[in-house]
Amino acid sequence: MRMYDIIQKKRDGQVLNESEIKWFVEGYASGKIPDYQMAALCMAIYFQGMNLEETAALTFAVRDSGERLDFSEIQGLRVDKHSTGGVGDKTSLVVAPIVASLGVKVAKMSGRGLGHTGGTIDKLESIKGFRTDIPVGEFKEIVNKTGIAIVGQNAELAPADKLLYALRDVTATVDSLPLIVSSIMGKKLAADDDCIVLDVKTGSGSFMKTKEKSRELAEWMVEIGKRAGKRMRALITDMDMPIGYAVGNSLEVIEAVETLKGNGPSDLTELCVILSAHILNLAEKGDLTTCEKMAREAIANGSALQKLVDMVEGQGGDSACILNTELFEKARYSCTVLAPTSGYITGVDTEGYGVASLLLGAGRNTKEDVIDMTAGLKLIKKTGDFVEEGEPIAILYSGKESGFKAAKDRLLSATRIGQTPPPETPLVLAVVE
């Protein structure tokens, strides 16, 4: 087999067979296939797509490219929740502690920032001392002891995806349905969780801009997960504006902590309660109404916050900053963005907000970039709010002043102001089982 022939075949819109897919995944993971050929194939897949059978074969090849975990030593049912990526999406930092506090084991492997979206691992690393690179044996011990751990993708786990993930990030091939499905599910299926709930984002801040594309993504992931013997569910949720008010790394951790203390933004709190309820329901803790009440109670009685403290301490982090968020490192510089005119914020290009955060240093433009954990933005006004001309709509934060102008311009160009308030959009648009 030759990589050239596989690239040509997909470039011309033909269907790749299972052996071809396994061959190029194994070849790329072992270093025999160079980046430039894999980048060409990713672009061919981006334009020509893959059918469900090809995507399932790619997913299983990614899963089988390295070690497959055995979580049988972890007592009880094991669950995972995964988001397809959004702006200001810190839900895992809230949902995982809620679920774990209610007796369901959370053994979660998360990713780093991809494109304009932030990654859970980058966010957690803004906590002083927090370790995300933990050996599998220790990971299982932590989950057994505390009921929860969130770690970075193990180097031995789906190594093909780790390489593809970094390559897609810098070659404009992130938002491809088969590449997203195989990346997410390849990793998820290499781990040994019993139940997986997927938070599939739709709208301007997601990789899937339309509800139709998001539903297709959800249906394919649920189907491939079921083929692998997992209990699956997907929620299609709105990403036409950031979740909560904070976008960035430490800024989002602080907002997640405040949510667990019962002081979070209403949209973030509601979405986290709904996601938690679906996970608990899939884990047979009760019907959805009962599970929703349990999730709210876990926030109200402080048990979910305590579970986050347990996780941070279990992974070597300084839990003092969870109990007192003033201890997080602050950005050296800030800049207030003012409304250019009066009216209602009728909508935003959420991806533009994510790009503004990137320009401030909160994400990566190349694989080697170092993230400024303090960088990002805090919204003062959101979609549906009325603003007066000259009133603050956001505050930008960064360790360098040089990114402020570009970030401010990007944020303003992504904000639409009109004279009529927009209709309200539900947080959850559909459930796929």
Predicted stretch roles:
Residues 77-100, 104-116:
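Glycine/serine-rich anion-binding loops at beta->alpha junctions
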